[in-house]
Design a protein with these regions (language model features):
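N-terminal Sec-dependent signal peptide, specifically the hydrophobic helical h-region
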Residues: 2-23, 293
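Extracellular/luminal ectodomains of metazoan preproproteins built from arrays
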Residues: 24-51, 56, 258-277, 282
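Internal glycine-rich, Lys/Arg-flanked active-site/core loops of soluble domains
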Residues: 59-211
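Conserved short secondary-structure elements within globular domains
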Residues: 203-220, 228-232
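Compact beta-sheet-dominated globular domain cores
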Residues: 219-274
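Cleavable C-terminal sorting propeptides in eukaryotic secreted/cell-surface proteins
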Residues: 275-297
Length: 297
């Protein structure tokens, strides 16, 4: 009997060795000002951009060009309609349309990765954005949704949390660095929710431009606050051994682009003006490593 058990154990060990082992390798990424991010705030052209999307059929074209995007939009559109009929959507700010709500549902569903993957790198040039970025309408609707909801969120700033697995982030200049996420960044008001997504890198963030989208997100239980690509943070604390961060909003924003789809170019300078609601623009002369979304494999 013992020899039979030993033989079986040996056979099982061989079988295990033959099975490909799936393992996520730890990634390394630097946090900086995300210079190649597409970070348009549509300042001063909010209505004109909406009219342009409508008159050119831009959204319909992009949906027809991407089956997964179309599927995600149609599913979100159905969910948004059901929530409106059920009365589960809270009072919305003036100017907030169905497209804004649907964009939030698309992003927080299964589409955040695709959008952010494009957003992080398509800011190389206006031409690159115009010719290769497949989610121009979605980017506009999501950006505007956050801007409209921002004022209704906290009435000020709020502490949120973000966890990531299989990736170690490092600030470009250590403690005291100035950074942007350069993408739409999901966070939670609850620390335990953020820890569920990982703690290989963990962020405690004071955001002043993030928008409370919990009641409109695909999963309402995550207490989600979504931070726009252009909010600027100071790294006020960084533990390089545990890869934990404390980020504090500067209450300023920085964009390399504005009204690009309508012909706007790249500004040459970044002006900072405290808490004013107008945009601030940042000129970029050198490349940098843009952070990854979650680092999951």
């Amino acid at each position: 009997m013992r020899s039979l058990v030993t033989a079986c154990a040996s056979l099982w060990a061989v079988i295990l060795l033959e099975i490909p082992q799936v393992r996520c390798e730890m990634k390394e990424a630097e946090l900086n000002m995300a210079p190649w991010s597409f970070d348009d705030q549509y300042s001063g052209c909010e209505d004109r951009m909406a009219e342009k999307i409508s008159s050119t059929g831009l959204l319909e074209t992009e949906l027809n060009n991407d089956g997964k995007f179309k599927e995600a939009w149609q599913k979100a559109e159905q969910t948004w309609g059901e929530r409106k009929r059920n009365g589960t959507i809270p009072a919305l700010p003036p100017g907030f349309t169905d497209e804004h709500g649907i964009a939030i549902l698309v992003y927080t569903g299964a589409f955040y990765y695709r959008l952010n993957e494009a957003v992080r790198w398509v800011g190389v040039s206006p031409q690159d954005y115009m010719e290769t970025f497949p989610y121009k309408a979605l980017h506009y609707y999501l950006t505007r949704a956050l801007q409209l909801l921002e004022k209704n969120c906290f009435g000020g700033c709020q502490t949120v949390y973000r966890g990531a697995k299989n990736i170690h982030f490092t600030p470009s200049s250590g403690k005291g660095s100035t950074i942007r996420f350069g993408q739409f960044t999901s966070t939670s008001l609850k620390k335990d929710v953020a820890l569920f997504f990982g703690n290989d890198s963990f962020f405690t963030i004071k955001t002043c431009l993030g928008a409370c989208i919990a009641s409109m997100a695909a999963l309402v239980t995550e207490n989600e606050v979504l931070i726009p690509p252009y909010e600027i943070f100071n790294v006020t604390n960084f533990n390089k051994d545990e890869h934990t961060f404390v980020l504090t909003s500067t209450e300023m924003r920085c964009s390399n682009y504005n009204c690009t789809y309508l012909g706007g170019g790249k500004p040459n300078a970044c002006g900072h003006a405290g808490k004013k609601p107008s945009p601030w623009f940042c000129g970029v002369d050198s490349p940098g490593w843009v952070p990854v979304v979650l680092g999951q494999c």
